[in-house]
Amino acid sequence: MTKQAFNYFLLHAGSLLIFSSLLVSCHTKTLDSKTKQVFRYNEHKNIGSLDPAFAKDNADIWAVNQLFNGLVQMDSLMNVTPAIAQFWTISEDAKVYTFSLRKDVNFHSHPLFGDHQTRRVTAHDFVYSFDRLKNPQLASPGSWVLQNVETYKAIDQHTFQINLKTPFPAFLGLLTMKYCSVVPKEIVTHYGTDFRSNPIGTGPYKFKRWEENIKLIFRKNERYFETNSKGGF
């Protein structure tokens, strides 16, 4: 990894740590009513995109982190923990990473998914998402994250494998970056560049409305796969 890329990774990790702390500290400021809870967050900088492939600064990262998930994530102690991948193995030569995916992760509702309005995330979705991230035509600022990746493939519906060019101990840390979030092909294909303002992901919140430079509204994702002891998140 280049020095510039490593510095960016540290910025990303630090941003997620700060935002995690913000969510905890602001929890007591949540407004309760008989029907809903409202969390208000003020961002001093305008959000540029809700497409994870363009989550390059703090404002974008915070918003995208509420909407999308990747294979792994970083906790408040900067440890890599499971996300959509429930566990993984690393080969003896430290070049092959095999991820076993959860079977209870669904995309946010959208009519394009058909009668059920949603569908389950599979390993093939990660193949598409990585292909998209690497595509020069997309010109994602995060394409460098996969520069040491030789190949990747879906072994089956719930197994995703990545082969590195050379061993890199911090690779799992790179995968926690929001650039590596899973996105649904049918939605991205439908919206094209407008996916930036019509995001469909798997995160704890789902997109409702965005008045750029004014306000951004999310709704709770009732189907979110990560829950606490009380069934919430």
Each predicted region: which residue ranges?
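Bacterial N-terminal signal peptides that target proteins for export
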Residues: 2-13
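C-terminal motif of bacterial Sec signal peptides marking the signal peptidase cleavage site
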Residues: 23-25
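Bacterial signal peptide processing site
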Residues: 27-30
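Short, well-ordered beta-strand elements
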Residues: 35-48, 86, 96-100, 126-129, ...
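N-terminal lobe/hinge region of extracytoplasmic solute-binding protein
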Residues: 42-92, 128-131, 138, 200
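Aromatic- and charge-enriched surface segment that lines or borders ligand/interaction sites
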Residues: 86-136, 161
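Surface-exposed binding/hinge segments that line
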Residues: 138-186, 204-211
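Ligand-site clamp/hinge motif
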Residues: 193-196, 223-233
